[in-house]
């Protein structure tokens, strides 16, 4: 995940989250470094202590639940606004898809068109641990769809289920631990996708292919609703309790729908100035 040319310093496991602000203060000069943090453990108390040390702080958020002490709050959910937050008066906001958190490869792909005409190759990715093994259920459903000739499955690093390997066939390819370039190539080799409303959805929209999407945890629902409002996805709703038949029914509806409108909507979600916008934002607090 971390590019090889980046400098890296690892926090010892002995340093608890309560001790972390002190450790950071000892390791880094507040005049040379700013902090960008992403995780539920970086709560209001943590942010307050970091700010008391004198650091500039950027917090990547997806819940808008706690009081924020950060200098900048990033939340790329489509429908989010500053009114959703409780924060310090001088806090700046980077909200919505104008500040989509996209990796460099996908920022470049925004500039390209996808000319694929066929709709026979599925891309499946539920990321992380996939606790409900939606990957397996979707794959079984896809095997029952005559239009589907090939299935590309990308598993998250924490995926531990085994049955998916037992149904592997010559038209099913399973991938794991991919670089962003490898992931983008598999996406571009696919002609439609099934994925949750998480970061993977943003990256798929950069590829510009039809996407069946849903949510299965709370922090995905706002993103899902935003993309649904933009008519950028085929909507499956809450998929937490879906079984194979549920996914198969959605796939039949999908293949009878108009893909063009979805892809036209995807083209409008992101612009080509995201990187420039972030550079300007970060410089504003330096």
Protein language model annotation of sequence segments:
Residues 271-286:
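C-terminal alpha-helical cap of glycosyltransferases
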Residues 234, 239-269:
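Conserved donor-nucleotide binding/catalytic region of nucleotide-linked donor-dependent transferases
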Residues 201-246:
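Catalytic binding pocket for nucleotide-activated donors in carbohydrate/polymer assembly enzymes
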Residues 188-199, 209:
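Acidic donor-binding loop of glycosyltransferase active sites
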Residues 117-189:
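Donor-nucleotide binding loops and adjacent catalytic segments primarily
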Residues 70-132, 161:
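A nucleotide-sugar donor-handling region in carbohydrate enzymes
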Residues 2-88, 93:
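Active-site and donor-binding regions of nucleotide-sugar-utilizing enzymes
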Residues 19-23, 45, 163, 181-185, ...:
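Short acidic active-site motifs
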